[in-house]
Amino acid sequence: MPLIAVAVVVFLAERVQVKAAFHESPLLLAAFIMGMLALVPAHEFVHALAYLKSPFSRRLIVGAWPRHGMCYLLYDGPLPRWRVLLMVAAPFLVLSVAPMLALWSGVLAPRPAVRAMLLFAVLNHTALCMGDYCIVLWRILRNVPRGALIHNAGWTTYWGAKRL
């Protein structure tokens, strides 16, 4: 929640420029809304690519749990611990860290209003990644030994030693 609060503060700090930009270009408002809505599918797609398997594999399962307000993607098969850790971290690295570095470095230097919108989107995405970090990443780092295989079976995750 603190990141979402920071995002709102950043957005409100630039509200005059943002409002003017939306007024000047109504398509910018539509693009901003579509971009925010596209964050969840993009996040799950980056997870899919990070499994380093075909995104069209029958073992790749995409779903939603509306009651809990979450979407998920999992690979129904054993994977090495390092690959699961990569899969968990990938959306944060691609959709939060990379754009933030581009904003800070000046590589991505749009108008202040667009910059505020991008920062708002990045901070919101970072907040949305907390489920990945708090639930999955932390539990794997704490409980699964290096070199182990991890297998999701339904809502249960198992791990075991690699077979030689």
Predicted ranges, named:
Residues 1-14, 67-164:
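Metalloprotease/metallohydrolase-associated module, dominated by Zn2+-dependent proteases
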Residues 25, 54-57, 96, 105:
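Generic serine detector
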Residues 1-35, 52, 63-65, 99:
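Active-site scaffold of zinc-dependent metalloenzymes
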Residues 40-45, 66-72:
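Hydrophobic, membrane-facing alpha-helical anchors
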Residues 24-41, 117-123:
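Membrane-embedded alpha-helical segments that form the functional core of polytopic membrane enzymes
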Residues 49-63, 137-140:
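Membrane-water interface of transmembrane alpha-helices
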Residues 39-55, 91:
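Active-site recognition of the HExxH zinc-binding catalytic motif
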